[in-house]
Amino acid sequence: MTHEQIEYRNYVLQGMASYGGDVAQALVWCGNHFTKLSNSQRNAINKLSAKERNQVIHELTMVFM
């Protein structure tokens, strides 16, 4: 996993913690709180392609299966 993916994973995990593991709600939370991230976190996440973000989400959701 790249540094950028780790930043994104940590961000999504923060959202999941707020919603008891609900991935869908966590992604909404992430969208609503994106501007509150530091510049370096936003830049790292913005560098990710859709495929790279999906890889992170896939990894997180496989834990619950």
Feature roles, as predicted:
Residues 1-38:
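The feature represents the first ordered module of a protein
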Residues 43-65:
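Short, compact, well-ordered microdomains
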